[in-house]
Amino acid sequence: IDKRHNDIKDWLAATGQAEGFDICAVTAAELPAIIGAGLDNYLQAGHHGDMGWMAETRNRRTTPTAMWDAARTAVIFGCNYGPDHDPMDNLAAKSSANISVYARGRDYHNVLKGRLKQLAGRLAARTGWQVKIFVDTAPLMEKPLAAQAGLGWQCKHTNLVSRGYG
């Protein structure tokens, strides 16, 4: 999606918000070589442990078009899963366990995939474009794509951190 398609970008952002997404950005479906080099260093150091599939899918991970050669653009949506209250307040209650906020609700893979399917169907109907969706279960380095799209920064802990959403 280039400048000729600004109306589509605006539509994606508005439709994404209607589907419950907080943020939307668009970037090229390609990653700079430094991302592949970083993954290579990680794999060569053995940091992937017994997750052999990471090495087996290295090329697909670093080349988004390896899974779908027609891909030219990545549209990244973000959703804040934080609760309305401060989750740190629960730490004082010694009678109950505390788990990560992202794991407290329904499985986010299912929640987000359902929303994305709705959005993808509407985009395909509107434009005639082919659309594929991924919710961090495919060998796709979505966090570097999100950073490249301007949604935040990927930190040492590998999470994407955003100024607006943490």
What are these model-derived regions, one by one?
Residues 1-166:
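Auxiliary alpha/beta "docking" domains used to position bulky ligands
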